[in-house]
């Protein structure tokens, strides 16, 4: 049976591609600064795959990813569309992706931060998850953050619809 050490898992998580950093999620949402960055990586990847990639489509998402990697993850150096054959302003596209991705990452991280699952069962903030007040509080926070994420996502959808004229890029 193959076992991974905690260090192996941390190393593998840090090698996953993300368009934003855990620090950016913390700065732009209500996620506390003391939350371990490693625990936010998987929620960022999940948010990219569930909420951003379907809007952009595989081709446009992969193009953004490739350009982001090419400029050493510095969004200020992304192409502005004047020098590329597809005429896409990747810098502006990144700016439109940034906030929805931060907020969806925050929502995906809430369960990681708020709920502990171990051999004793499911615990919510150190007590039984079945306590209604705490579960209701979690749901209230989750719903509020979801509305914010959906609002930013709607803006991204409008931007893509209005500016991406080559619909083949959205496939």
Residue ranges of each PLM-predicted region?
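Catalytic-loop motifs flanking and including active-site residues across diverse enzymes
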Residues: 101
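Conserved short "hinge" loops at termini or chain/domain junctions
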Residues: 1-98, 112-171
């Amino acid at each position: 049976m193959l076992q991974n050490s905690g260090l192996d898992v941390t190393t593998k998580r840090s090698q996953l591609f993300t368009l934003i950093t855990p620090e950016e999620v913390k700065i732009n949402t209500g996620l506390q600064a003391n939350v371990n960055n490693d625990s936010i990586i998987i929620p960022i990847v999940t948010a990219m795959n569930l909420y951003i990639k379907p809007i952009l489509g595989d081709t446009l998402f992969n193009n953004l990813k490739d350009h982001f990697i090419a400029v050493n993850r510095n969004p200020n150096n992304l192409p502005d569309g004047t020098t590329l054959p597809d005429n896409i302003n990747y810098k502006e596209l990144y700016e439109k992706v940034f906030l929805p991705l931060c907020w969806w990452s925050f929502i995906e991280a809430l369960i990681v931060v708020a709920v502990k699952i171990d051999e004793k069962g499911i615990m919510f903030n150190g007590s039984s998850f079945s306590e209604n007040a705490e579960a209701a509080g979690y749901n209230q926070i989750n719903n509020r953050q979801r509305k914010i994420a959906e609002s930013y996502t709607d803006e991204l959808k409008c931007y893509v619809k209005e500016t991406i004229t080559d619909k083949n890029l959205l496939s």
